[in-house]
């Protein structure tokens, strides 16, 4: 037989595995030559370190067969014959009894293949089909085999055949002759070495490494193109294959993306055609197109029969039975026992899959619950975050309000001091007025007396003059006094007007404050309601979370139990897995032994084939001998023996394949189960982690909830402290009143009883003789009196308990009084703080007034300085103009003089004209300079205007600030008025507190009275007991006397009187109860009013604190504005200084220009006098020395200096 060229190539170390190779090229002449020469394969190759399956085609009988090869280079092999026959069916699919061997190159999922696959066995250029596929080694049976393109190995399970398509016509007729075979073998590859050594030594060039064209010559062009097209889809990863050949029936050309079944059997069909063609005559005969059909053996028919579904127990039994039955000589009963044992061992693995599904379902439920708990925790955290800012804001508001209240109290005290001072001043003024009026009356009386004296005494004229002087002086004094009085009255009127205005503002502020207080109170109520609701929700959520936590703990316990059970089961299954693994290794070793035996059989077959080939060569050498017939007979016998051996080998291979498949299936099942066990362990570990995290989260959430609840409880306690104290005081007052009323009623009852007892005693003393006969009735009365004594003792105990409770109530009232005193002290401190803040505000106001005045003064100074600078500039300009006029006049005079002289000197006119032109140019330049100076002047004027506007703006801003300050003062006055009102409210509260104290004192006095009454009652009781004892003794002495009628009537009358008294006392009791209820209602109303007033005061304090803060902010803004004005003032000062410097430079420049002009004028005059030349006309001279030109010169010089 021929060996593949890949065997000759050097190959690396190969692991144990199944290698599958498909050889489609016919037997070459070189190989036949090697067989003829008797070349024998070494025996050690059959026992190499690797094994595999190589599919080759033997071209003797025209039929292919499967050869088991060791996978090593040069290894021998033996084959199993594959028989074929024509099929008369027209459908194009394989029949159910087809015996086509499994083609490992038909379809393997997930691996790309080259588009052109070679069918030649000697093609070294093939990258896939030329190499043997390798399965897993014996050491790697426990783990899953890697499926990557680099390692192109696969198990026997993945190598399933596909349905065959209609192939080319194949002639299965008997061989034509031996001569044709000889010619066939001799015609191919003559110059090459034969046999395995030739393959080893021969290396084909790349040009000759092409696929065999043995079949392509017989196939039409369309089938070749179709095969080439189908080879591209040969390794589609989306393909799915079936393990049964008869189940796949598809058309030959399908447009679907799945590979065509033609690609699955293209190689087998080609090999069979090649085998048939190799034994035909050189002249090919025309053949009818028929469908392929292969002969079937009983083994393949048994494998292809309808079986149970793959996942059922029957299917597993059948597979295990087939595996154990193949190649064993045991009885059916022993084989079935083994099958049952294997199934029992595999049953727990199936159960593990169900247990793993349950664990996965439990894990899903746990994850859902974890998500729900996390959501709830997030919601609670959000609620807490929402409540925290409100709580913090309320605390801040409380602090701010307390600060504002303290500041307002200080302001109130300050205002009170100012009001007292104003009252003192008014009183002083009133005293002065009274004194002035008294002086006026005294002076009037003096005037009247003086007038009388004048009338009486008509003395000399000097005396009259003295008197008149005195009168005049007194009149002047009176006028001065009247003027002072008028001034004082005017001041009083102004003060009264201011007071009325303040009162009106205070009323408005009070109304606004009341509204604001109500609004704030409503907001506080809403906030408290929201807090209560949030607390209720938090408590509910906490309860829900606790319940869920308990559920989770129960679930965790159950999961832990399941984990322990699963761990035990996994240990058991691991032990079972190891046992199965050992059994599989044992079976693998048996398979290896069987394969070794197969290889030995193949070696023997190869030797026989070589012998036969030698004989054939000898027959060719001696064609005319008589031995030819015998050789042919021997050939037929050997062919029959080969067929039998091939059939046996095929059966053994099928059995081995089945065993391998079943073993691989069991291995895959065991691997899947092991993977599931590992996944379960990982899932259990993850579940434990998640449970720990859940516990930590629950603990954190519970801690956070506890903290939030504690904070909310503290807030609620703080808020409810005042309410609870007030309610407790009210309830205690009500209880005291009720107890007092009850005690009064009991005292009345006891007094009535005492009065009745005294009357009874008097009567009994008068009628001792009558009562002695009625001893029995009196004993009954004594029993009744004993019962009354018991009731009195119970009443006494009740009174003692009530007295104790009253004492406790008094102690509580004392504590409340202390708390109220502390609150009053705190209010006093807050008032002091308000006073201090008011003083600070006044000081800040004074500083602002001072700064504003200073800024106004500085602005005025700046304006005056700028005006003075302008005036100086204007005066300088006027001076310059006057000087220029004078110079022009002098120049005109000189010109007139020069005109007279020019008449004499007319010779130098030309020179003078040139000089005149030059002077004209100079005048034009001076005019330009003058224009620039005017422009500079205008710019300066504009700058001055801008500065004036800025000063005006600053003044306006200062006026606005002054207005704002006035507004602040008005607000402060309003706040002071509000403070006064708050002081009034505080005074009212103190009055109410005093009233409560008075009521407490009254209650104490009443309690003392009750105690004294109780002592009196006890004394009366003692006296009654003594009287009872006396009566008992008297009754004992007067037992013999009997007067029942009179005593009975008297006792009945006494009973009626007592009943009437009891009814009257009950009526009084009802009246007292009604009065007590009314009083209780009044007390409750008073407590509610007190609470409202306290809240009102607190709200007012908060508002005042807010207003004080707003005023502080306004003061800060005013200070910032003042700083900004200072900066602007400094900028203005800098600009003025720069202007002064520019003016000084201009003045210096003007002086220098004046000097230059005087020098030029003197020089021109000297030249004119020296030359004695006259001008043409006076007009030209006047035009040259025009005053405007001189002014332009001056302005030009000024502009130059300014530009510098």
From Swiss-Prot:
Motif (ZIM): 48-62
Record keywords: Acetylation, Cell junction, Coiled coil, Phosphoprotein, Tight junction
Residue positions, PTM N6-acetyllysine: 581
One of the GO BP terms on file: microtubule cytoskeleton organization
InterPro entries in the cross-refs: Myosin_tail (IPR002928)
Residue positions, PTM Phosphoserine: 95-96, 98, 135, 137, 140, 155, 165, 214, 217, 260, 278, 340, 353, 1176-1177
Biased composition (Polar residues): 126-140, 166-190
Keyword Phosphoprotein among UniProt keywords: yes
Keyword Coiled coil recorded: yes
GO MF annotation list: microtubule binding
Region (Tail): 1162-1204
Gene Ontology CC: bicellular tight junction; myosin complex
Location of the region described as Head in the Swiss-Prot/TrEMBL record: 7-359
One Pfam family in the UniProt entry: Myosin_tail_1
Domain of life, source organism: Eukaryota
Coiled-coil ranges per UniProt: 360-1161
Region (Disordered): 25-48, 68-269, 1156-1182
Subcellular location(s) of the protein: Cell junction, Tight junction
Task of the protein: Probably plays a role in the formation and regulation of the tight junction (TJ) paracellular permeability barrier.
Family statement: Belongs to the cingulin family.
Domain notes: Deletion of the TJP1/ZO1 interaction motif (ZIM) decreases but does not abolish colocalization with TJP1/ZO1.
Quaternary context: Homodimer. Interacts with TJP1/ZO1 and SPEF1.
Protein name: Cingulin
Species of origin: Callithrix jacchus (White-tufted-ear marmoset)
Gene for this chain: CGN
């Amino acid at each position: 037989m021929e060996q593949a060229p890949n065997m000759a190539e050097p190959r690396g170390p190969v692991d144990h595995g199944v290698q599958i190779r498909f050889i489609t090229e016919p037997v070459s002449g070189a190989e036949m030559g090697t067989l003829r020469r008797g070349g024998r394969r070494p025996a050690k190759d059959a026992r190499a370190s690797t094994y595999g399956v190589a599919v080759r085609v033997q071209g003797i009988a025209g039929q292919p067969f499967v050869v088991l090869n060791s996978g090593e280079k040069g290894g021998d092999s033996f084959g199993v014959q594959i028989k074929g026959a024509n099929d008369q069916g027209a459908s194009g699919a394989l029949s159910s009894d087809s015996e086509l061997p499994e083609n490992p190159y038909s379809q393997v999922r997930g691996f790309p293949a080259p588009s052109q696959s070679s069918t030649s066995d000697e093609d070294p250029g093939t990258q896939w089909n030329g190499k043997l596929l390798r399965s897993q080694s014996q050491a790697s049976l426990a783990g899953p085999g890697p499926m990557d393109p680099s390692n192109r190995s696969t198990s026997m399970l993945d190598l399933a055949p596909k349905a065959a398509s209609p192939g080319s016509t194949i002639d299965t007729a008997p061989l034509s002759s031996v001569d044709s075979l000889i010619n066939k073998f001799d015609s191919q590859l003559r110059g090459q070495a034969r046999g395995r050594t030739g393959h080893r030594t021969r290396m084909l060039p790349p040009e000759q490494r092409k696929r065999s064209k043995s079949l392509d010559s017989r196939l039409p062009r369309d089938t070749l193109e179709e095969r080439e097209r189908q080879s591209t889809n040969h390794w589609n990863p989306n393909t799915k294959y079936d393990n049964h050949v008869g189940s796949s029936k598809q058309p030959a050309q399908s447009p679907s993306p799945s590979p065509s079944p033609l690609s699955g059997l293209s190689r087998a069909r080609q090999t069979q055609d090649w085998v048939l063609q190799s034994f035909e005559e050189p002249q090919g005969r025309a053949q009818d197109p028929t469908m392929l059909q292969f002969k079937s053996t009983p083994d393949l028919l048994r494998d292809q029969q309808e079986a149970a579904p793959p996942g059922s127990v029957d299917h597993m039994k059948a597979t295990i039975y087939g595996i154990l039955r193949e190649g064993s000589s045991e009885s059916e009963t022993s084989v079935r026992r083994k099958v049952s044992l294997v199934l029992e061992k595999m049953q727990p693995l199936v159960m593990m899959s169900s247990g793993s599904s349950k664990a996965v379902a439990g894990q899903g439920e746990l994850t859902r619950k974890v998500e729900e708990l996390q959501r709830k925790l997030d919601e609670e955290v959000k609620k807490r975050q929402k409540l925290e800012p409100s709580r913090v804001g309320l605390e801040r508001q409380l602090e701010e309000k307390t600060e504002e209240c303290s500041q307002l109290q200080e302001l109130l005290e300050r205002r009170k001091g100012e009001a007292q001072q104003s009252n003192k001043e008014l009183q002083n003024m009133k005293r002065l007025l009274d004194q002035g009026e008294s002086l006026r009356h005294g002076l009037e009386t003096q005037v009247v007396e003086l007038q009388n004296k004048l009338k009486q005494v008509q003395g000399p004229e000097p005396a009259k003059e003295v008197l008149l002087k005195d009168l005049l002086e007194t009149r002047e004094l009176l006028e001065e006094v009247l003027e002072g009085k008028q001034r004082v009255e005017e001041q009083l009127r102004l003060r009264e007007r201011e007071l009325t205005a303040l009162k009106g503002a205070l009323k408005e502020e009070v109304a606004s404050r009341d509204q604001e207080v109500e609004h704030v109170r409503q907001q506080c109520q809403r906030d408290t309601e929201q807090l209560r609701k949030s607390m209720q929700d938090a408590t509910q959520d906490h309860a829900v979370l606790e319940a869920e936590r308990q559920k989770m703990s129960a679930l965790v316990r159950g999961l832990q139990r399941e984990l322990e059970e699963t761990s035990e089961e996994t240990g058991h299954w691991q032990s079972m897995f190891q046992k199965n693994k050992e059994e599989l290794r044992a079976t693998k070793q048996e398979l290896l032994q069987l394969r070794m035996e197969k290889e030995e059989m193949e070696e023997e077959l190869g030797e026989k084939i070589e012998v036969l080939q030698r004989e054939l060569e000898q027959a060719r050498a001696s064609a005319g001998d008589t031995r030819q017939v015998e050789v042919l007979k021997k050939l037929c016998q050997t062919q029959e023996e080969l067929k039998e051996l091939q059939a046996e080998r095929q059966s053994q291979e099928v059995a081995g394949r089945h065993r391998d498949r079943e073993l691989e299936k069991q291995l895959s099942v065991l691997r899947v189960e092991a993977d599931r066990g590992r996944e379960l362990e990982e899932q259990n570990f993850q579940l434990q982690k998640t449970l720990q995290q859940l516990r930590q989260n629950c603990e954190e959430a519970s801690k956070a909830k506890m903290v939030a609840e504690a904070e909310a409880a503290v807030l609620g306690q703080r808020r409810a402290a005042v309410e609870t104290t007030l309610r407790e005081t009210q309830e205690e007052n009500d209880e005291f009143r009720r107890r007092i009323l009850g005690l009064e009623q009991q005292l009345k009852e006891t007094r009535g009883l005492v009065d009745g007892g005294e009357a009874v005693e008097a009567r009994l003393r008068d009628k001792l003789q009558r009562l002695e006969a009625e001893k029995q009735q009196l004993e009954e009365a004594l029993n009744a009196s004993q019962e009354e004594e018991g009731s009195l003792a119970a009443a006494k105990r009740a009174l003692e308990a009530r007295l104790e409770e009253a004492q406790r109530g008094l102690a509580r009232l004392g504590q409340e009084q202390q708390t109220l005193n502390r609150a009053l002290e705190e209010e006093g401190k807050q008032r002091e703080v308000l006073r201090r803040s008011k003083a600070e505000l006044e000081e800040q106001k004074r500083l602002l007034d001072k700064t504003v005045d200073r800024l106004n003064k500085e602005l005025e100074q700046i304006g005056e300085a700028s005006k003075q600078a302008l005036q100086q500039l204007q005066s300088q300009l006027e001076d310059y103009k006057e000087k220029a006029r004078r110079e022009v006049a002098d120049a005109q005079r000189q010109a007139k003089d020069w005109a007279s002289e020019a008449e004499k000197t007319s010779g130098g006119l030309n020179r003078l004209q040139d000089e005149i032109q030059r002077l004209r140019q100079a005048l034009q330049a001076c005019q330009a300079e003058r224009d620039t100076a005017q422009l500079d002047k205008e710019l300066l004027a504009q700058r001055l205007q801008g500065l004036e506007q800025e000063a005006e703006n600053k003044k306006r801003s200062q006026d606005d600030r002054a207005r704002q300050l006035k507004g602040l003062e008005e607000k402060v006055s309003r706040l002071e008025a509000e403070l006064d009102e708050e002081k009034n409210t505080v005074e009212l509260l103190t009055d109410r507190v005093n009233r409560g104290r008075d009521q407490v004192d009254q209650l104490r006095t009443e309690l003392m009275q009750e105690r004294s009454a109780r002592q009196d009652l006890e004394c009366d009781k003692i006296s009654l007991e003594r009287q009872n004892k006396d009566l008992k003794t008297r009754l004992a002495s007067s037992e013999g006397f009997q007067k029942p009628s009179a005593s009975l009537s008297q006792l009945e009358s006494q009973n009626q009187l007592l009943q009437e008294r009891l009814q009257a006392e009950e009526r009084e009791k009802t009246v007292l109860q009604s009065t007590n209820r009314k009083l209780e209602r009044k007390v409750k109303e008073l407590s509610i009013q007190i609470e409202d007033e306290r809240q009102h005061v607190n709200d007012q304090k908060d508002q005042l604190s807010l207003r004080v803060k707003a005023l502080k902010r306004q003061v800060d803004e005013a200070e910032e504005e003042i700083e900004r004005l200072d900066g602007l003032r400094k900028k203005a000062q800098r600009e003025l200084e720069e202007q002064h410097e520019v003016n000084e430079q201009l003045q210096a420049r003007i002086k220098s220009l004046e000097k230059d002009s005087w020098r030029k004028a003197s020089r021109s005059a000297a030249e004119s006098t020296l030359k004695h030349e006259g001008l043409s006309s006076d007009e030209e001279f006047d035009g040259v020395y025009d005053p405007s030109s001189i002014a332009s010169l001056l302005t030009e010089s000024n502009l130059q200096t300014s530009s510098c």
